[in-house]
């Protein structure tokens, strides 16, 4: 790369002229030094700048050189600028251009270069100030939106989803609370397909918030305030008492039978639960929970209060295929035959809030104020002697019984579900009322008399079975050990609807005398 050539003329800029003088003066002295050394000569340089400052260079001693100069008579060669220019033209140089000097003087910067570098630095600083702020810092928190379960408000979950919570919270990725699991919360849902939460006691499920939703028998979609996985067969307590055997972690011991004989402290509640029979809760139950005798004792201790909170289950599968006794515990775990919510919604009995008719039952009407609870049966309905009593007078006040659509046989198109689901017992059906037999290893406290549901569904009634859970009457426990495999009276028979009351009485007698 060649040297940069400049025009040999006076530099008008004072700064540039000073820089050029310094550089070229040093270059001249450098050349003089080289010449003096290489050629063994004496050189003296005397330079005055434009402000008459003296700059001199002497290879040995200036005085000696000057003395020789004064003593020398005639110079051998004397040149001026004109002679130099003429000599350059003869050698082929233009004389107007001169290359920049090399060596140490080229290391120095001119004022023009300094200004150029300074302007470039200022421009770069401006660019960094303008665009540097948009670059994110190394430590930043990216905001994200995550779903969390609300601990206080009741939620309505979809039948097809596991846990739907509408609340969203925006937090940072560095928030340690996002790494902690959410606490279980009570959910109010219509279908419980095996969610991970369950309540600590039945009192939280049977609070006063349900009183406004019961009694009028709304549609089964939005009526049950239950735990996320619990089913009617796993809730053996009616009036806010703790779950005795199902969830013993936070539950007090079960109250005695004498305490249960008092007047109920809550209004009658009707809870329609469309459970799909989740299998996941079976892993949480021990053998003691699945013991039929324990389940019977639980049902007997709660027999007097079972009328206050009946449970109407519309999706519990059948137990007939397994040959199990009618126990309240395993009713929600047979998923061989299920009635999904889509089929229930297509039925006229469950498609409207008025689908569940209560008939002439006075205890399941609109809820009365809390200070007027429905008392249990009067003292005249105390347990009779151990001998079986085949029938009761038909003028007796109709009892309340839970109704369930659990005993559905595969292939049965539900021909007996009419326009309403009546939960009253037929006045012409034989009724069995006897105390608990001690030989069955049940609780020695005898339950008050109650009735079983109708032997088979009628046009005005739904399919009835004792699989409605542990919120039923105590006679569930009486017949629980007596049923055995002969449960044909609960299957929807293919006989015509005009079957007389004598046939029903005969079938119920077969049931009670077994």
Curated annotation (Swiss-Prot):
Phylogenetic classification of the source organism: Eukaryota, Metazoa, Chordata, Craniata, Vertebrata
Function of the molecule: Transcriptional activator which binds specifically to the MEF2 element, 5'-YTA[AT](4)TAR-3', found in numerous muscle-specific, growth factor- and stress-induced genes. Mediates cellular functions not only in skeletal and cardiac muscle development, but also in neuronal differentiation and survival. Plays diverse roles in the control of cell growth, survival and apoptosis via p38 MAPK signaling in muscle-specific and/or growth factor-related transcription. Plays a critical role in the regulation of neuronal apoptosis.
Subunit structure of this chain's protein: Forms a complex with class II HDACs in undifferentiating cells. On myogenic differentiation, HDACs are released into the cytoplasm allowing MEF2s to interact with other proteins for activation. Interacts with HDAC4 (in undifferentiating cells); the interaction translocates MEF2D to nuclear dots. Forms a heterodimer with MEF2A. Interacts with MAPK7; the interaction phosphorylates but does not activate MEF2D. Interacts with MYOG. Interacts with CCAR2 and HDAC3.
Gene: Mef2d
Tissue-wise expression: Widely expressed though mainly restricted to skeletal and cardiac muscle, brain, neurons and lymphocytes. Differentially expressed depending on if isoforms contain the beta domain or not, with the total expression of the beta domain-lacking isoforms vastly exceeding that of the beta domain-containing isoforms. Isoforms containing the beta domain are expressed primarily in skeletal and cardiac muscle and in brain. Also present in lung and testis. Splicing to include the beta domain is induced in differentiating myocytes.
PROSITE patterns (UniProt xref): MADS_BOX_1, MADS_BOX_2
Protein name as it appears in the record: Myocyte-specific enhancer factor 2D
DNA-binding positions: 58-86
Keyword Membrane: no
Modified residues (Phosphoserine): 98, 106, 110, 121, 180, 190, 231, 251, 437
A GO BP annotation: positive regulation of DNA-templated transcription
Modified-residue entries (N6-acetyllysine), positions: 245, 432
Post-translational modification: Phosphorylated on Ser-437 is which is required for Lys-432 sumoylation and inhibits transcriptional activity. Phosphorylation on this residue by CDK5 is dependent on p35 and calpains. Phosphorylated by PKA at Ser-121 and Ser-190 represses transcriptional activity in embryonic and postnatal skeletal muscle, and stabilizes protein levels. No in vitro phosphorylation by PKA on Thr-20. Phosphorylated and activated by CaMK4. Acetylated on Lys-432 by CREBBP. Acetylated by EP300. Deacetylated by SIRT1 and HDAC3.
